[in-house]
Amino acid sequence: MAKTIKVTQTRSSIARLPKHKATLKGLGLRHIRHTVELEDTPAVRGMINQVSYMVKVEE
């Protein structure tokens, strides 16, 4: 079984770079306090690093 992580959006995506909005969409986050469980892969970690100022990660 693959390790999973919980990612929660903590800040709004309004007035952000289009690239960062697309990253949130790729992570499956839609609004503030929305939480998703994702597989812990290098690709997902890279997306989280790109928008780290808008999300919280629980391992």
UniProtKB/Swiss-Prot annotation:
The keyword Ribosomal protein applies. One of its GO terms (biological process) is translation. InterPro entries: Ribo_uL30_ferredoxin-like_sf, Ribosomal_uL30_bac-type, Ribosomal_uL30_CS, Ribosomal_uL30_ferredoxin-like. GO terms for molecular function: structural constituent of ribosome. Keywords: Ribonucleoprotein, Ribosomal protein. Gene3D superfamilies: Ribosomal protein L30, ferredoxin-like fold domain. Belongs to the universal ribosomal protein uL30 family. NCBIfam families: rpmD_bact. Part of the 50S ribosomal subunit. This is Large ribosomal subunit protein uL30. It comes from Glaesserella parasuis serovar 5 (strain SH0165) (Haemophilus parasuis).
